């Protein structure tokens, strides 16, 4: 027989903080109650439920504002990766979620694995890719990732340095 519970925290697949839900006894006994994620619903829990819903609404508004701000920041951000390639321009390895998170952190953008709806996402081709992100409170964003070969990157640096040398030589004359 399922039990009625008042959730104290958001629980994936069950409900949000302040919701009264039903769950199987084993799940309740072994997970929800020991982790203090829920209490058994009774007559006295209605006041607590109202308080939890009010807190959840305030937190949801803050999370939505923060997520929209982050989505606006991500709209203009392009993460660049230089990778090793073979002569046929096939990448050695791939650009993974961990690489994207680390590169974003260097640009003061905090992302976690939870932000990536496709948990096994990896970029295996050169070029500019769009990566879908799921932020808090249903806000979605797109992050752009540009993957180029190290040899192309080195060629651009060499071209820039040769141009600088040409300018320096002209200045000496």
Curated annotation (Swiss-Prot):
Specify the superkingdom.
Bacteria
**MF terms in GO:** rRNA binding; structural constituent of ribosome
* GO biological process entries: translation
Q: Which UniProt keywords apply?
A: Ribonucleoprotein, Ribosomal protein, RNA-binding, rRNA-binding
Cellular component annotations (GO), alphabetically ordered: ribonucleoprotein complex; ribosome
Q: Which InterPro entries does the UniProt record give?
A: Ribosomal_bL9 (IPR000244), Ribosomal_bL9/RNase_H1_N (IPR009027), Ribosomal_bL9_bac/chp (IPR020594), Ribosomal_bL9_C (IPR020069), Ribosomal_bL9_C_sf (IPR036791), Ribosomal_bL9_N (IPR020070), Ribosomal_bL9_N_sf (IPR036935)
Q: Which family does it belong to?
A: Belongs to the bacterial ribosomal protein bL9 family.
- List the NCBIfam families hit by this protein, alphabetically: L9
**Function according to Swiss-Prot or TrEMBL:** Binds to the 23S rRNA.
User: What name does the UniProt record give this protein?
Assistant: Large ribosomal subunit protein bL9
């Amino acid at each position: 027989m399922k039990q009625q519970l008042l959730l104290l925290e958001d629980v994936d697949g069950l409900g949000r903080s302040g919701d009264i839900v039903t769950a199987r006894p084993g799940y309740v006994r072994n997970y929800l109650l020991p982790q203090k994620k829920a209490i058994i619903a009774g007559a006295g829990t209605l006041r607590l439920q109202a308080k939890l819903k009010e807190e959840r609404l305030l937190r949801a508004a803050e999370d939505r504002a923060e997520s929209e701000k982050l989505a606006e920041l991500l709209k203009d951000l392009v993460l660049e990766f230089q990778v090793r390639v073979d002569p046929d321009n096939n990448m050695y390895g791939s650009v993974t979620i961990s690489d994207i998170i680390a590169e974003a952190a260097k640009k003061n953008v905090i992302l976690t694995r939870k932000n990536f709806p496709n948990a096994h996402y990896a970029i295996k081709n050169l070029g500019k890719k769009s990566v879908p992100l799921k932020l808090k409170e249903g806000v979605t964003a797109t992050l752009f990732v540009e993957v180029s070969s190290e040899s192309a990157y080195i060629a651009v640096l060499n071209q820039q340095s040769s141009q600088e040398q040409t300018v320096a030589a002209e200045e000496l004359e």
